[in-house]
């Protein structure tokens, strides 16, 4: 948190959204690839959106970034894919354009009063029991940390750690092996990073090497869910 406060608003917000910082990414890449991308800064996408917002305050600019990146390219995409996979047309009523316009007109001080979703919590007072109205936000996170010790363990070892793994041309194998061992032993949790490596390997096989044997990017998750259900 202090590290994010030491930089400009856009950079700080971008760092707070990231699951890996630039130093960790560079450590994970092979020296050759790290040199190639040395001048690339992924946070430029955050800065561009932040600067596009004409609101004068930091909070509104951060919310604009969240709508453009975290919402549009993240949560909504995943929910839509998951819904359509089961024949469901998912709707997001609180993203109705009139509701969004109203939300943007709410003064910043009121948006932040009372903690997260303060205004919404006040609206439902008396309509929901107190424990529901005041509880912490709960999302639908994928249990990657557990999966890589269970149903995704073999896949990672066979595809990412294999001597002939395509992803080896991108990454430092020693660093990858270290974080894998840290994860398995419980010293640290690296679920999101390990998943990125699985996806990088699949992407490389599909788009750079034209491998017809490559499964779709969602196959690992589907297989993990299937195996997890079998275990349960």
Tell where the protein language model's regions lie, with residue ranges:
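Adenosyl-5′-phosphate
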Residues: 2-232
């Amino acid at each position: 948190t202090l590290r994010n406060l030491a930089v400009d608003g856009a950079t700080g917000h971008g760092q707070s959204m990231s699951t890996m910082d630039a130093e960790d990414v560079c450590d994970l890449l092979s020296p050759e690839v790290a040199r190639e991308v040395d001048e690339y800064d992924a946070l430029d996408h955050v800065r561009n959106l932040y600067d596009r917002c004409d609101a004068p305050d930091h909070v509104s600019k951060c919310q604009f970034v969240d709508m453009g990146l975290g919402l549009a390219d993240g949560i909504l995409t995943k929910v839509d894919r998951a819904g359509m996979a089961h024949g469901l047309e998912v709707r997001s009523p609180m993203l109705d354009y009139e509701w969004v316009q109203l939300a943007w007109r709410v003064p910043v001080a009121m948006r932040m009063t009372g903690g997260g979703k303060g205004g919404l919590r006040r609206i439902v007072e008396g309509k929901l029991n107190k424990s529901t109205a005041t509880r912490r936000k709960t999302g639908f996170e994928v249990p990657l940390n557990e999966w890589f010790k269970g149903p995704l363990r073999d896949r990672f070892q066979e595809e990412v750690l294999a001597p002939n793994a395509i992803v080896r041309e991108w990454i430092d194998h020693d660093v990858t092996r270290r974080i894998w061992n840290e994860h398995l032993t419980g010293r640290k949790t690296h679920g999101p990073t390990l998943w990125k490596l699985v996806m990088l390997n699949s992407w490389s096989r599909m788009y750079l090497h034209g491998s017809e044997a490559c499964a779709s990017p969602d196959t690992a998750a589907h297989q993990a869910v299937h195996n997890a259900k079998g275990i349960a």
